[in-house]
Amino acid sequence: MEIIFYHPTFDTQYWICELEKQLPGARVREWKAGDNRPADYALVWHPPVEMLQGRALKAVFALGAGVDSILSKLRDHPDMLPLSIPLFRLEDTGMGRQMQEYAVSQVLHWFRRFDDYQALKLASRWQPLPEYRADEFTVGIMGAGVLGAKVAESLQPWGFPLRVWSRSRKSWPQVQSFAGQAELGEFMQGTRVLINLLPNTAETAGIINQTLLAQLPDESYVLNLARGVHVVEEDLLAALNSGKLKGAMLDVFSREPLPQESPLWAHPRVAMTPHVAAVTRPMEAITYIAETISRLERGEPVSGQVDRQRGY
């Protein structure tokens, strides 16, 4: 079995060594420009078109939860990866736990009004504030994939009303489900904390815009953990400046690294991290990929295959 590997920043030799340990008999090599030798599987992140073009592969694995970089290249180069070759993404591999930690910590930060107390501290003011009630602090999650389900599960013990919006209706315990465009407005109107975990598709690009934000209750919060292109940053800033939004926590941006001239840097009600909410953990990812390849070789069912029509 021949496997080609490409990632611009990962420790390639570590991945090759560990993959060969978990897949006895497999030969894994780093792909470099001009390498047209046959391969059975490709493990990639932001791959050059020529890496995949014209190859008779059994499957391609994206080394992250998102596949938008591959799908965007396919729109211009459809022969890069024919539909006959399945494309897989990492379903969890430790990302679920990281998203849980991030989401719970930020929701509690807002619920306990730590942002307000930080502002009071900077103003040298000693002022106890009224508490928020958990049963009135509704958290709405956009996106009902593996990560959305994990985040909802982690928030349940805290007593917040939970709701989810997705393409199709979900039956999650203790979570109110809203489905499709027709129910998006109702979902937004009752949401105090909006958590974005949507996939990056043509339909979801720019979805968090002026029209959508206007439907939130006043003094709501936005937590973006998905992709920067989901948020129209000018509209987000306008909602913050008008008081419609009380705060925003952003892990992803329309341009990364965030340009120095962006007004997001200096905004007092914007907190941010540099796209680190959930990173690929090598050992968990290697184990998942090795197990999935082994199941494919045995002809057994697997999960994680991307529906290219939907984009996730």
From Swiss-Prot:
Cellular localisation: Cytoplasm
One Pfam match: 2-Hacid_dh_C
Swiss-Prot/TrEMBL keywords: Cytoplasm, NAD, NADP, Oxidoreductase
Cellular-component GO terms for this entry: cytoplasm
SUPFAM superfamilies: NAD(P)-binding Rossmann-fold domains (SSF51735)
Active site: R227, H275
UniProt enzyme class: oxidoreductase
Enzyme Commission number(s) from the entry: 1.1.1.79, 1.1.1.81
Major place of residence: cytoplasm
Role: Catalyzes the NADPH-dependent reduction of glyoxylate and hydroxypyruvate into glycolate and glycerate, respectively.
Family the UniProt entry places it in: Belongs to the D-isomer specific 2-hydroxyacid dehydrogenase family. GhrA subfamily.
The protein's name in its UniProt record: Glyoxylate/hydroxypyruvate reductase A
Species of the source: Klebsiella pneumoniae subsp. pneumoniae (strain ATCC 700721 / MGH 78578)
